[in-house]
Amino acid sequence: MAHKKGVGSSRNGRESHSKRLGVKLFGGQAAIAGNIIVRQRGTQHHPGENVGIGKDHTLFALTDGVVTFRKGRQDRSFVSVLPVAEAKA
């Protein structure tokens, strides 16, 4: 029997860095073309009018306007960017 504990590697230290996911621009906020609206894993939110989707499912504004969220079929969330003139009407 060993009288001293064998020196092994630590069992801690493998927590991953946070990925900073989530909604970056909320409903009613102004968006400039190219602004990131949502960072997500998979399509929790789907692209609507004037919104593009990146290969990592990031939603971004294609035009300047106001961000809106709406529910579609089967409770699917859509994100759109409405031009300012349209949003006021």
Swiss-Prot record:
Q: List, alphabetically, the InterPro entries matched.
A: Ribosomal_bL27 (IPR001684), Ribosomal_bL27_CS (IPR018261)
One GO cellular component term of this record is: cytosolic large ribosomal subunit
UniProt key word Ribonucleoprotein? yes
Question: GO molecular function terms here?
Answer: structural constituent of ribosome
Q: Which domain of life is it from?
A: Bacteria
Sorted alphabetically, the Gene Ontology BP terms of this entry are:
translation
Which family is this sequence assigned to?
A: Belongs to the bacterial ribosomal protein bL27 family.
Q: What is this protein called?
A: Large ribosomal subunit protein bL27
